[in-house]
Amino acid sequence: MDKVLLIDKPKEWTSFDVVAKIRGILRSLQPQNQSTESVLEKVKPPKIRVGHAGTLDPLATGLLVILVGKATKRQDDYMKKDKVYEVTVRLGSTSNTGDDEGEKTHVSDDIPSLDEVRKTILQFIGKIHQIPPAYSAIKIDGQRAYKLARAGKDVQIKPR
């Protein structure tokens, strides 16, 4: 089976959680060896390759491209595609995690005008470099940044 699946990743699931769930479902659909032979003589079904093109942070929801079988060989092709992000923003506060889940470190009633918001948004059009938050799925020395941050480690991520 060679497929590309478009999955709406639920909040609090990691991208790997989605891959593992899809892999489990696909394995359960494989025909089982119903032989009355001994367990040692049963033939294991072939492994199913399942991967994803891109990672979403655990708190993010949205489209996750799941690749099955030979489609996994085209991961780089999917990773190079343009992406569009839709966000919801709460103005007037910051948190220690850079998201709505963390402890509020600053709260203000001084909300910018719609015109100020529009001018600020213009700074984010085109190719830009940003520093991802410490509580993100980016890997640092093989570990997810959010896991390091939750463990109290100082997480330094370079602009991308």
Q: What residues fall within each predicted segment?
A:
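Catalytic/RNA-binding core of pseudouridine synthases
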Residues: M1-R160
